[in-house]
Amino acid sequence: MNFNPIFIPIVLSLLGLLYMFFKAKWVKKQDPGNEKMVSISSAIKKGALAFLNAEYRLLLFFVVIASVALFGISLVVETTSWMIIPAFVVGAIFSGLAGNIGMRIATDANSRTTQAARTSLPKALNVAFGGGTVMGLGVAGLAVLGLSLFFMFFINQFMNDGGSFYDNMTVVLEALAGFSLGAESIALFARVGGGIYTKAADVGADLVGKVEAGIPEDDPRNPATIADNVGDNVGDVAGMGADLFGSYVATVLASMVLGNYIIKDMSDYASEQFSDPFGGMGPILLPLFIAGIGIIASIIGTLFIRIKNNEAKEAQVQASLNTGNIISILITLFSCWFLIDYLLPDTINGMKFFGEGTRDIPSQNIFYSTIVGLAVGYLISAFTEYYTALGKQPVLNIVQNSSTGAATNIIAGLATGMKSTFSSVILFALAIWGAYELGGFYGVAISASAMMATTAMQLAIDAFGPISDNAGGVAEMSELPKEVRERTDILDSVGNTTAATGKGFAIASAALTALALFAAYVTFTGIDGINIFKADVLAALFIGGMIPVIFSALAMESVGKAAMKMVQEVRRQFKEIPGILEGKAKPDYEKCVEISTNAALKEMLLPGIITIVTPVVIGFAMGPEALGSYMAGVAVSGVLWAIFQNNAGGAWDNAKKSFEAGVEINGKIEKKAVSYTHLRAHETARNLVC
């Protein structure tokens, strides 16, 4: 009996999920704290689950409608099987499940992190990062498992139909694309809905509570404080989990599609079907193997994240996270050498380069492409950390500019976000050019797969942020001793940066994934290139560039509408419920949670529908070349807007933290009561851009 190599990534994904269950059990075994802490944590979890359940019920209708549409497509498109439908449905379920796993463990870990902080900072870090690890491994494990199982099933179903290897594999990969489509569809709505919820609650809690009433962040007297903490979970945990799940799956799938074209190129060159010890599928299997080994590398990397000093500051905590990240990257890189040597021929003969004929590419060039991808993943995090971290020049510049009021605060923050696009875009440009020269579009796709291989680690670091933020909220609302909040604030401050770097990684992954998908699209449609001298193609390019702008506008408008209702509700409660500000009466937390939930569910639909419908209309009305131009416009504009918004928001966030800790402006130490204009400028601008 021949060994089927597809079992290797299946086993690796199951190992990741097994470790996830072990880590989740360990987190839940930790002390959740006193009765008040447990009550607050339960309220946050209840609100988050209520939102997710309502969101998933709404998305169920979308899944049903999309499934019917896919069935219709399968009847008229020869290469599309009806089996794309179960793949689509399972992809949607797995995407939702990935976000749900992360959200549940995050809400379990928050009070446990707070309780651990009563003992020591190192223990609090272990609990918070343990919760993040569960989320990261859940996303990566489910993605690799789902792709591998469906690929194995479709191989058995379609590869013996009598056609050519290339034609049969095209049917397999088109059916597998349903899994990616389901994942990306849920990710879109989860990210938008979670983001609207988060920012609406944030504005209400901060502007009325902190600025107008002058009470601290996460103070139990603030009616919006539970909604604010719920938002951290549904947006930055569940939303981010679904987001990276979709990007992860899309990257691996695009690489597999391009691997099929590489096999066709080699077969055409040799005038016979390419063969290898893996059923002639080595180039297709490589991205799955890289993803699988990345899970193990991430697990090993998490073991190195620890601090020993209870007096450690932000720099030591950040250094610990960076160490674990670097170790996971190096293990992935080392493994890629052996995987490429194992799965690819020594030379890829006849690889097509658009407009340049064919080249013979040594397999080590593909390994060099993985170096490019892993370097991009690390450097984009480093660039984001520089622009958003406490004590770095960009944040200090915003702090200093706040001395003259709100206007200069906003100007400095906007300028920081805009400047930050330079280094990231230059990095992307060099990476795209370098990976393409090394291995064509397949090299670009494999570089993206290598970068995404450490998704489990990146998500663990990212989820650590909102867990730490919630832990600080639980400490404040439970009125614990000052040193507990100081310890959670250290983790929260680092978490602000890791949240920004996590989004930076998501942006980088989206950029390289978009290019890999674009390459797969161009190759699949058979168009020779995109000629912008054609009027319809140029028009589509401009439309594509406009979509991220209008998407951002709609999202911000939605946040504004929801935030206005939240602000009015918080003001109403302060006015109509006697004793709230004196701590003698309990606010109506559920009302604020309800406002954010209803607003997010209602307002997420229009941006999502525009994003899905526009390319369909462009494709049918203007043709495949114009659609390719549209995709290029979306990719370029979207990356620029995402980098700007992410880094401006992260820098403002840590500028606020600087004020709260006490900073020197013009030789004078100023703290969180620095002035109404400082906080007003920060809160308005940050919530606007984030």
PLM-predicted stretches and their roles:
Residues 1-680, 686-689:
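Hydrophobic packing and interface segments
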